Amino acid sequence: MENKQQHRWVLYILLVIISIFMLFPVLWVISSSLKPSTELFAWPPSIFPNEITLNNYISAFQNANFGRYLFNTVFVTITATIITLIINTMAGYALAKYRFRGSTIILVFFLSTLMIPLEALMIPMFIVLKNLGLYNTLWGVIIPPAATPTGVFLVRQYIMSIPDEMIEAAKIDGASDWKIFVRLILPLAKPILATLTIFSLMWRWQDYIWPLIAISDSNLYTLELALANFVGEYSVDWGPLLAMAVLTMIPLITVFLLFQRFFIRGIMMSGMKD
Protein backbone atom coordinates (compact mmCIF):
# COMPACT_ATOMS: atom_id res chain seq x y z
CA MET A 1 0.00 0.00 0.00
CA GLU A 2 2.84 2.38 0.88
CA ASN A 3 4.59 1.58 -2.41
CA LYS A 4 1.43 2.50 -4.31
CA GLN A 5 1.21 5.80 -2.43
CA GLN A 6 4.88 6.55 -3.18
CA HIS A 7 4.43 5.75 -6.87
CA ARG A 8 1.37 7.97 -6.98
CA TRP A 9 3.23 10.89 -5.40
CA VAL A 10 6.14 10.42 -7.80
CA LEU A 11 3.68 10.43 -10.69
CA TYR A 12 2.01 13.61 -9.41
CA ILE A 13 5.36 15.35 -9.03
CA LEU A 14 6.38 14.37 -12.56
CA LEU A 15 3.06 15.62 -13.93
CA VAL A 16 3.49 18.93 -12.10
CA ILE A 17 7.02 19.36 -13.49
CA ILE A 18 5.88 18.51 -17.02
CA SER A 19 2.93 20.90 -16.68
CA ILE A 20 5.24 23.71 -15.59
CA PHE A 21 7.48 23.15 -18.63
CA MET A 22 4.44 23.04 -20.91
CA LEU A 23 2.78 26.14 -19.45
CA PHE A 24 5.88 28.29 -18.97
CA PRO A 25 6.02 29.61 -22.58
CA VAL A 26 2.32 30.52 -22.41
CA LEU A 27 2.74 32.27 -19.06
CA TRP A 28 5.80 34.10 -20.39
CA VAL A 29 3.86 35.37 -23.43
CA ILE A 30 1.00 36.58 -21.21
CA SER A 31 3.39 38.25 -18.78
CA SER A 32 5.46 39.87 -21.54
CA SER A 33 2.35 41.25 -23.24
CA LEU A 34 1.72 43.28 -20.07
CA LYS A 35 5.23 44.78 -20.00
CA PRO A 36 6.20 48.15 -21.49
CA SER A 37 8.51 47.92 -24.50
CA THR A 38 11.52 49.11 -22.48
CA GLU A 39 11.14 46.19 -20.09
CA LEU A 40 10.79 43.43 -22.70
CA PHE A 41 14.52 43.19 -23.36
CA ALA A 42 15.79 44.32 -19.98
CA TRP A 43 18.63 42.31 -18.44
CA PRO A 44 18.36 40.27 -16.32
CA PRO A 45 14.96 39.21 -17.66
CA SER A 46 12.02 38.98 -15.28
CA ILE A 47 9.10 36.60 -15.48
CA PHE A 48 6.58 39.02 -14.02
CA PRO A 49 6.29 42.65 -15.18
CA ASN A 50 7.57 45.34 -12.85
CA GLU A 51 5.05 47.73 -14.36
CA ILE A 52 1.78 46.39 -15.79
CA THR A 53 0.48 48.20 -18.87
CA LEU A 54 -2.29 47.57 -21.39
CA ASN A 55 -0.70 49.76 -24.07
CA ASN A 56 0.25 46.73 -26.13
CA TYR A 57 -3.37 45.58 -26.29
CA ILE A 58 -4.57 49.09 -27.13
CA SER A 59 -1.96 49.32 -29.88
CA ALA A 60 -3.03 45.93 -31.27
CA PHE A 61 -6.59 47.21 -31.79
CA GLN A 62 -5.75 50.75 -32.89
CA ASN A 63 -2.65 50.28 -35.05
CA ALA A 64 -2.59 46.60 -36.03
CA ASN A 65 -6.23 46.33 -37.23
CA PHE A 66 -6.74 43.45 -34.80
CA GLY A 67 -10.52 43.91 -34.71
CA ARG A 68 -10.81 43.30 -38.46
CA TYR A 69 -8.63 40.20 -38.34
CA LEU A 70 -10.59 38.91 -35.35
CA PHE A 71 -13.90 39.34 -37.21
CA ASN A 72 -12.53 37.49 -40.26
CA THR A 73 -11.27 34.63 -38.10
CA VAL A 74 -14.49 34.32 -36.09
CA PHE A 75 -16.59 34.33 -39.27
CA VAL A 76 -14.42 31.71 -40.97
CA THR A 77 -14.19 29.51 -37.87
CA ILE A 78 -17.88 29.51 -36.93
CA THR A 79 -19.18 29.14 -40.50
CA ALA A 80 -16.69 26.40 -41.36
CA THR A 81 -17.49 24.55 -38.12
CA ILE A 82 -21.23 24.60 -38.84
CA ILE A 83 -20.68 23.29 -42.38
CA THR A 84 -18.24 20.67 -41.09
CA LEU A 85 -20.73 19.43 -38.49
CA ILE A 86 -23.54 19.16 -41.05
CA ILE A 87 -21.52 17.34 -43.72
CA ASN A 88 -19.53 15.06 -41.45
CA THR A 89 -22.49 14.10 -39.27
CA MET A 90 -24.69 13.17 -42.22
CA ALA A 91 -21.87 11.27 -43.94
CA GLY A 92 -20.89 9.47 -40.74
CA TYR A 93 -24.51 8.49 -40.05
CA ALA A 94 -24.97 7.14 -43.58
CA LEU A 95 -21.78 5.07 -43.40
CA ALA A 96 -22.66 3.75 -39.94
CA LYS A 97 -26.32 2.79 -40.29
CA TYR A 98 -27.15 2.47 -43.99
CA ARG A 99 -26.29 -0.81 -45.67
CA PHE A 100 -25.50 -0.30 -49.34
CA ARG A 101 -23.03 -1.69 -51.82
CA GLY A 102 -19.70 0.09 -51.71
CA SER A 103 -20.09 1.68 -48.26
CA THR A 104 -16.85 0.09 -47.04
CA ILE A 105 -15.03 1.25 -50.17
CA ILE A 106 -16.27 4.80 -49.63
CA LEU A 107 -15.06 4.73 -46.01
CA VAL A 108 -11.65 3.40 -47.06
CA PHE A 109 -11.48 6.09 -49.74
CA PHE A 110 -12.23 8.78 -47.14
CA LEU A 111 -9.58 7.47 -44.76
CA SER A 112 -6.99 6.99 -47.50
CA THR A 113 -7.00 10.73 -48.13
CA LEU A 114 -5.38 11.13 -44.70
CA MET A 115 -2.23 9.56 -46.16
CA ILE A 116 -1.95 12.23 -48.86
CA PRO A 117 0.20 15.18 -47.75
CA LEU A 118 -1.71 18.43 -47.63
CA GLU A 119 0.95 20.07 -49.77
CA ALA A 120 0.17 17.65 -52.62
CA LEU A 121 -3.45 18.82 -52.66
CA MET A 122 -2.74 22.54 -52.59
CA ILE A 123 -2.24 23.09 -56.34
CA PRO A 124 -5.39 21.25 -57.55
CA MET A 125 -7.44 22.82 -54.75
CA PHE A 126 -6.16 26.27 -55.72
CA ILE A 127 -7.02 25.69 -59.40
CA VAL A 128 -10.56 24.60 -58.50
CA LEU A 129 -10.88 27.54 -56.11
CA LYS A 130 -9.87 30.03 -58.80
CA ASN A 131 -12.13 28.48 -61.45
CA LEU A 132 -15.09 28.76 -59.08
CA GLY A 133 -14.37 32.45 -58.48
CA LEU A 134 -13.70 31.92 -54.77
CA TYR A 135 -10.08 33.07 -54.77
CA ASN A 136 -9.42 35.97 -52.43
CA THR A 137 -12.72 35.51 -50.59
CA LEU A 138 -13.46 34.21 -47.10
CA TRP A 139 -15.70 31.53 -48.62
CA GLY A 140 -12.66 30.23 -50.43
CA VAL A 141 -11.09 29.62 -47.03
CA ILE A 142 -14.26 28.07 -45.57
CA ILE A 143 -15.59 25.62 -48.16
CA PRO A 144 -12.64 23.46 -49.38
CA PRO A 145 -11.64 21.96 -45.99
CA ALA A 146 -15.24 21.56 -44.75
CA ALA A 147 -15.55 17.79 -45.23
CA THR A 148 -12.82 16.14 -43.17
CA PRO A 149 -12.10 12.39 -43.22
CA THR A 150 -11.20 12.52 -39.53
CA GLY A 151 -14.60 13.98 -38.69
CA VAL A 152 -16.48 11.45 -40.82
CA PHE A 153 -14.57 8.58 -39.20
CA LEU A 154 -15.15 9.80 -35.63
CA VAL A 155 -18.87 10.34 -36.18
CA ARG A 156 -19.25 7.01 -37.95
CA GLN A 157 -17.52 5.12 -35.14
CA TYR A 158 -19.62 6.81 -32.47
CA ILE A 159 -22.96 6.31 -34.23
CA MET A 160 -22.15 2.63 -34.71
CA SER A 161 -22.32 2.30 -30.91
CA ILE A 162 -26.00 3.36 -31.01
CA PRO A 163 -28.16 0.18 -31.05
CA ASP A 164 -29.93 -0.55 -34.34
CA GLU A 165 -32.99 -1.57 -32.32
CA MET A 166 -33.62 2.07 -31.40
CA ILE A 167 -33.73 3.07 -35.06
CA GLU A 168 -35.94 0.12 -35.95
CA ALA A 169 -38.34 1.02 -33.12
CA ALA A 170 -38.54 4.59 -34.41
CA LYS A 171 -39.33 3.32 -37.92
CA ILE A 172 -42.09 1.09 -36.53
CA ASP A 173 -43.58 4.18 -34.86
CA GLY A 174 -43.70 5.81 -38.29
CA ALA A 175 -40.69 8.13 -38.05
CA SER A 176 -39.08 9.12 -41.34
CA ASP A 177 -35.34 8.84 -41.97
CA TRP A 178 -34.91 12.58 -41.53
CA LYS A 179 -36.88 12.60 -38.27
CA ILE A 180 -34.82 9.69 -36.95
CA PHE A 181 -31.64 11.58 -37.78
CA VAL A 182 -32.76 14.87 -36.22
CA ARG A 183 -34.79 13.64 -33.23
CA LEU A 184 -32.89 10.46 -32.31
CA ILE A 185 -29.35 10.36 -33.68
CA LEU A 186 -28.30 13.97 -33.10
CA PRO A 187 -29.31 14.09 -29.40
CA LEU A 188 -27.52 10.78 -28.75
CA ALA A 189 -24.45 11.98 -30.65
CA LYS A 190 -23.91 15.15 -28.58
CA PRO A 191 -20.54 14.00 -27.15
CA ILE A 192 -19.00 13.31 -30.56
CA LEU A 193 -20.53 16.50 -31.97
CA ALA A 194 -18.86 18.44 -29.14
CA THR A 195 -15.59 16.66 -29.91
CA LEU A 196 -15.87 17.46 -33.60
CA THR A 197 -16.76 21.05 -32.76
CA ILE A 198 -13.58 21.46 -30.72
CA PHE A 199 -11.48 19.85 -33.45
CA SER A 200 -13.01 22.03 -36.15
CA LEU A 201 -12.61 25.21 -34.11
CA MET A 202 -8.96 24.37 -33.51
CA TRP A 203 -8.32 23.46 -37.14
CA ARG A 204 -9.93 26.59 -38.57
CA TRP A 205 -8.74 29.03 -35.91
CA GLN A 206 -5.12 27.93 -36.23
CA ASP A 207 -5.08 27.32 -39.98
CA TYR A 208 -2.28 29.20 -41.70
CA ILE A 209 -1.27 27.39 -44.91
CA TRP A 210 -4.63 27.34 -46.69
CA PRO A 211 -5.61 30.98 -45.92
CA LEU A 212 -2.13 31.98 -47.07
CA ILE A 213 -2.84 30.37 -50.46
CA ALA A 214 -6.49 31.38 -50.78
CA ILE A 215 -6.15 35.04 -49.71
CA SER A 216 -3.95 37.88 -50.93
CA ASP A 217 -6.03 40.86 -49.75
CA SER A 218 -4.72 41.99 -46.36
CA ASN A 219 -8.23 43.13 -45.35
CA LEU A 220 -9.32 39.47 -45.46
CA TYR A 221 -6.44 38.14 -43.37
CA THR A 222 -7.16 35.81 -40.49
CA LEU A 223 -5.34 36.17 -37.17
CA GLU A 224 -2.69 33.60 -38.07
CA LEU A 225 -1.84 35.44 -41.29
CA ALA A 226 -1.88 38.76 -39.47
CA LEU A 227 0.51 37.49 -36.79
CA ALA A 228 2.92 36.18 -39.42
CA ASN A 229 2.81 39.42 -41.41
CA PHE A 230 3.20 41.53 -38.28
CA VAL A 231 6.87 40.62 -38.31
CA GLY A 232 8.63 43.34 -40.29
CA GLU A 233 11.62 42.94 -42.57
CA TYR A 234 13.97 44.87 -40.31
CA SER A 235 12.16 45.12 -36.98
CA VAL A 236 9.42 43.53 -34.90
CA ASP A 237 7.06 45.42 -32.62
CA TRP A 238 7.07 42.71 -29.97
CA GLY A 239 4.63 44.29 -27.53
CA PRO A 240 1.53 44.38 -29.79
CA LEU A 241 2.57 41.08 -31.37
CA LEU A 242 2.58 39.34 -27.98
CA ALA A 243 -0.75 40.97 -27.10
CA MET A 244 -2.26 39.66 -30.35
CA ALA A 245 -0.89 36.20 -29.59
CA VAL A 246 -2.55 36.21 -26.15
CA LEU A 247 -5.88 37.37 -27.58
CA THR A 248 -5.63 34.64 -30.22
CA MET A 249 -5.18 31.93 -27.57
CA ILE A 250 -8.08 32.93 -25.31
CA PRO A 251 -11.02 31.70 -27.47
CA LEU A 252 -9.53 28.22 -27.99
CA ILE A 253 -8.77 27.78 -24.30
CA THR A 254 -12.29 28.93 -23.39
CA VAL A 255 -13.95 26.54 -25.85
CA PHE A 256 -11.90 23.59 -24.63
CA LEU A 257 -12.70 24.29 -20.98
CA LEU A 258 -16.41 24.50 -21.78
CA PHE A 259 -16.54 21.31 -23.86
CA GLN A 260 -13.79 19.16 -22.34
CA ARG A 261 -16.27 16.80 -20.61
CA PHE A 262 -17.97 16.00 -23.92
CA PHE A 263 -14.61 15.97 -25.72
CA ILE A 264 -13.12 13.19 -23.58
CA ARG A 265 -16.32 11.14 -23.63
CA GLY A 266 -16.66 11.47 -27.39
CA ILE A 267 -13.09 10.32 -28.04
CA MET A 268 -13.53 7.31 -25.74
CA MET A 269 -16.85 6.27 -27.28
CA SER A 270 -15.62 6.64 -30.87
CA GLY A 271 -13.36 3.62 -30.54
CA MET A 272 -15.77 1.28 -28.79
CA LYS A 273 -17.28 -0.44 -31.84
CA ASP A 274 -15.70 -1.39 -35.16
Please name every model-derived segment.
Residues 2-274:
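A structural signal for multi-pass alpha-helical bundles of membrane permease subunits
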